[in-house]
Structure formats: structure tokens, C-alpha cells
């Protein structure tokens, strides 16, 4: 069975099987004017497929005590099944049916569209979400990474079954990956390719992005985005678009992320919370994406201390490309990196998802092990040079009261003028 490509990840488990089917179409591929289309499609794939309407499908899955869902990420749709080994034979074909024969019933389309719009409206009340949305638009413009996978409420309102059909019809045509993790019976491996719903799957056309929507498009020259909100806190997001998963410099930036944002010993936590007490929450965000991933420092502060919080964030950002980490700090970052890897591979589902992610992005199965082996060779100077290549042109997104935003904008303008 060449499509989907089958990967097996044996894990000792009490008769549990996790399956992940990755399709290389995510929210970055939302057509212009229909942002949120792939997320809406993802929510509908588990609302009826093949011979099963939404009620029959729910009864079948829940009657087995199993879980079935589909999630839209920036780079892919990921179908997930978790069940017992005994039920795998009858439930695994559902993954193929969701891809090859989704029902997309008009009533379910209207329901899921309404639920998504309601969720987006609730998110508008969250200052963190507003700051994140502003930063995406500032950095990626109208490109594929310029919006939350859930989309834009105003554009979702126009989506119907006819708009989703072309997206659904192309799902089986690209090279997809199916990973099974847990207690995988040999007979499943031997027979899955002959199961009715997996037979005669179209040959994958490859995952070449030529002709597809760019990750960033129509990005302006502005370096600051302001989102006014009547709130008691100010959210600050400082960062820039960097590189894709598997890039030679990624490991160095991943160590910087661990140094900055992992645990109470992290630099952001120590500097902003412990030393100065200016932040409620701090984080360093650097997701593993196929395209230029955001490397973002985040903090929330009270209005009275928000300018100091911004000053501290700017100082930390500048230090990344001006002075190398100490050997002790780098060694701690290495330990955190290894710990983060281990935490991300604790369950069968996590292991299966990691396998399909690596395969879909053209990385070897032992990519993580290679990174761990390469840690010892990375020096503070190597990390400094990577920061100098990728972290020199940050953009700032703010959400807070109008008075706070004006004050912080003046502070940012002074930096730009310097």
C-alpha cells in the first residue's frame, strides 16, 4: 500500500491502538476569502462518512469506547483514532471513509459553521488571542500562516457544502501517511492494505507546494500591531518568522526557546516574574511548522508595569544576538530539550503523530535521536550565530487599553528610531 504510507510504532500498552492519518492540506491552504475552510472541513469529517450518518458514526465509535476526531493544523489535517485492539478491524476503515467519502450533510455544515463562529466570537474577548491574531497578520499578511486555523468569522459565514466539496475531493490525491502505535497485531499490518476502504487508494501526487498559497503574502513594512481592548492586563508578543522544521539552524533556536521559556528556571520567568514581578504569564513560542515558524516571546502585565515589561522583553531579545549563552545555561537548555522530547512521546497517540509529522515533512524517522546526538556539538557561539541570522527584525503585537497602547507605541518608536 503506497498511499497512504503505513508506519508502525510498537509500544507496550494494555491492548490500546492509536492511529494517525495525516493529509498534507492544512489551514495554510485555505483559499483566499475562505479562511477557516479546512478547519470546518476537519470538523465535518467525523460527522458522517460512507454508510454512516453523524448519529450512526457516533454510536459506532462511542459504543466501542473509542475516540475519533480530525484536527486542522497549519500544515495538515490529522485524523485520529484511539481504540482497543479488538475493535481496530472494524474502526480503522472509518479513517479511509472520512477521507474518501465524507458526507458533508448541509445540516451538519450549518451546525459546525455556527459552532466555529461562536468559538471565534468568544476568542475575541481573550486578549492573548487578539494579540496572537494581530501578530500573525502583522508578520504573515494575507499568506497561509496569517490567520488562526479556525479562520475568520466573516469569511466562514459564507461557506457551505458547495464551497467545501473541492477541498474534500482532493484529500485522497496527495501523499498521505498512516501511523499505528501501541499494541499493533500482525494481522492488522498484513491486512490493512486489503481492507475495502483502503484498496485502490489513488497514488499520491507528492507534497510539492509549488502553485499553492505562500506562507506570507502582502506583508507591510509596519513593525507594530495594536489591538485596543477594555481589559485589566496588557499582552505583549515580540518575535519574528524564522525557519521550517528540519532546518540546520532549528536545533539552536530550539535550545534558545528552552532557555527562554521552559520551566521556572527559564530566563523569561526569572527576569520578568522573579526579579521584577511585572508579568502574570510568560512563554516562548516556536512551533514545528513546514514553513517559516514564529519565534515569539509572550508576556502579560498590568498596565502600570507594562512599559517595564516591554523594556525587559526587548533587552532579552537583543541579548540573544549580542552575547552568547554561558556553558551552564546551554547545558541546562540541552537537558530541557531532551525532557521536552520525552514529554511529547509519552502516549501512543503522541508517538503516532510524531511519526506522521516527520514523514510528511520529509525528515528521517530518527530525526529526534539525531538532534539529541547533535546537542553536544552545539557551542554557545553556534547558538549566537543562529540568533544573529534569524532574530534581528522582531515585530510587536500588543493588546490592552488605548492608554497603555499609546505609551507602549511611543516606547517602540524610540527603539525604531535608535
Protein language model features and the residues they cover:
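His/Glu-based metal-binding/catalytic segments typifying zinc-dependent metallopeptidases
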Residues: 7-27, 35, 177, 202-269
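Active-site-flanking structural segment that lines cofactor/substrate pockets
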Residues: 28-29, 54
